[in-house]
From Swiss-Prot:
Natural source organism: Histophilus somni (strain 2336)
Signal peptide positions on this chain: none
Cited function: Part of a membrane-bound complex that couples electron transfer with translocation of ions across the membrane.
E.C. number(s) listed in UniProt: 7.-.-.-
Protein name: Ion-translocating oxidoreductase complex subunit A
Pfam families named in the record: Rnf-Nqr
PANTHER family: INTEGRAL MEMBRANE PROTEIN OF SOXR-REDUCING COMPLEX, ION-TRANSLOCATING OXIDOREDUCTASE COMPLEX SUBUNIT A
Length: 193
């Protein structure tokens, strides 16, 4: 049990996919202008990452490895992720049309979010079992969502700040992301990985 807690802490905080591994930067910068959109994107990504980790493990274990088709891993994982994202998009469209409109193009872009594919591939490379794969996917998405919501809150505060003209827009967003990355480096001594 303690191993799973350490896996969650190390994946969500210490080895954060956005701030440490630089995966998932497109939705991180694109959806973080409003906190409501960031929360919605975080929840959608959380669902997709967790389910995609489970599906990728099952496909690897029961399809690719027995057939010795490991060379198709990336292609098959992209297909699995696309199916999970399409399912998520249909569910969000039915349950919350407002959130569906707010997320716009970013929801289908979860398919090409490199963090989702990165988590699926890292699960295989780290030789996680089924439980560890699901926990790793969930904690990676938890870290992604946490960083996304915190960054959206900072960007909303920046709109009210008096920022010099050359730093407005993407410049101050990247500076803020860098400072967030430095803040998350403080977690590096928390757990030895």
């Amino acid at each position: 049990m303690i191993d799973y807690i350490l896996l969650i802490i190390s994946t969500a905080l210490i080895n954060n996919f956005v701030l440490v591994k630089f995966l998932g930067l497109c939705p991180f910068m694109g959806v973080s202008k409003k906190i409501e959109t960031a929360i919605g994107m975080g929840l959608a990504t959380m669902f997709v990452l967790t389910v995609a980790s489970l599906c990728a493990y099952l496909v690897e274990r029961y399809l690719l490895t027995p057939l010795h088709a490991n060379f198709l891993r990336t292609l098959i994982f992209i297909l699995v992720i696309a199916v999970v994202v399409q399912f998520t998009e249909m569910v969000i469209h039915k349950t919350s049309p407002t959130l569906y409109r707010l997320l716009g193009i970013f929801l289908p872009l979860i398919t090409t979010n490199c963090a989702v594919l990165g988590v699926a591939l890292l699960n295989i490379n780290l030789a996680h079992n089924l439980t560890q794969s699901v926990i790793y996917g969930f904690s990676a998405s938890l870290g992604f969502s946490l960083v996304l919501v915190l960054f959206a809150a900072l960007r909303e505060r920046l709109t009210a700040a008096d920022i010099p003209l050359p730093f407005r827009g993407a410049s101050i967003a990247l500076i803020t992301a860098g400072l967030m990355s430095l803040a998350f480096m403080g977690f590096s001594g928390l757990v030895r990985v």
